[in-house]
């Protein structure tokens, strides 16, 4: 558009005021889901429970890749070796995959944008004026931080019942 102030801001080619709602531009709705499946069974001397879980947590941030996924697998066993001696075994595995925009800090901790500052050019490309950049594009084009964490936990418990008032437990 043409500059409405002919003798001022002569270096600014796009001098219009937009009704820019940064909350609406940056944030939206998302979905989270969690699924679990377990199987249990056994006999008088041996019981088990196997469970698996998947969780996906999306992000309200509309720009860039931002989500969290978690996988869990767990096996619990109880072996009654004798009437007085019991072994409990728990083996658990978990994995977390998290993705966040590399420049999310620059986008979310930036000062409030200038009044009328557009989020993009008229043809949908990133917009910047001097050192002011549209924060949505920092998230969209700044790359991804990927965090992958896996863990295994093994727990064994040995119980011996001497009498109805006294047990010995070792883990």
Named regions from a protein language model:
Residues 27-44, 138-171:
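Outer-membrane beta-barrel transmembrane strands
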Residues 26-27, 64:
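Residue-level marker of alpha-helix boundaries and capping positions
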Residues 38-42, 51, 76-78, 90, ...:
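Transmembrane beta-barrel domains of outer membrane proteins
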Residues 19-20, 43-52:
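Transmembrane beta-strand segments of Gram-negative outer membrane beta-barrel proteins
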Residues 22-24:
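Surface-exposed cleft-lining segments at the edges of enzyme active sites
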């Amino acid at each position: 558009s043409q500059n409405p102030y002919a003798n001022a801001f002569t270096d600014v080619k796009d001098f219009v005021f937009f009704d820019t709602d940064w909350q609406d531009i940056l944030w939206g709705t998302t979905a989270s889901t969690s699924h679990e499946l377990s199987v249990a069974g056994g006999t008088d001397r041996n019981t088990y429970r196997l469970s698996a879980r998947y969780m996906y947590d999306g992000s309200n941030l509309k720009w860039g890749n931002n989500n969290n996924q978690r996988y869990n697998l767990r096996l619990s066993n109880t072996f009654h070796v004798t009437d007085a001696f019991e072994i409990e075994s728990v083996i658990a595995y978990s994995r977390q995959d998290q993705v966040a925009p590399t420049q999310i800090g620059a986008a979310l901790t930036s000062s409030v944008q200038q009044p009328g500052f557009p989020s993009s050019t008229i043809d949908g490309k990133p917009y910047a004026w001097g050192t002011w950049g549209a924060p949505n594009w920092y998230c969209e084009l700044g790359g991804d931080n990927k965090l992958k964490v896996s863990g295994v936990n093994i727990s064994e418990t040995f119980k011996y019942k001497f009498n109805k008032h006294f047990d010995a437990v070792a883990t």
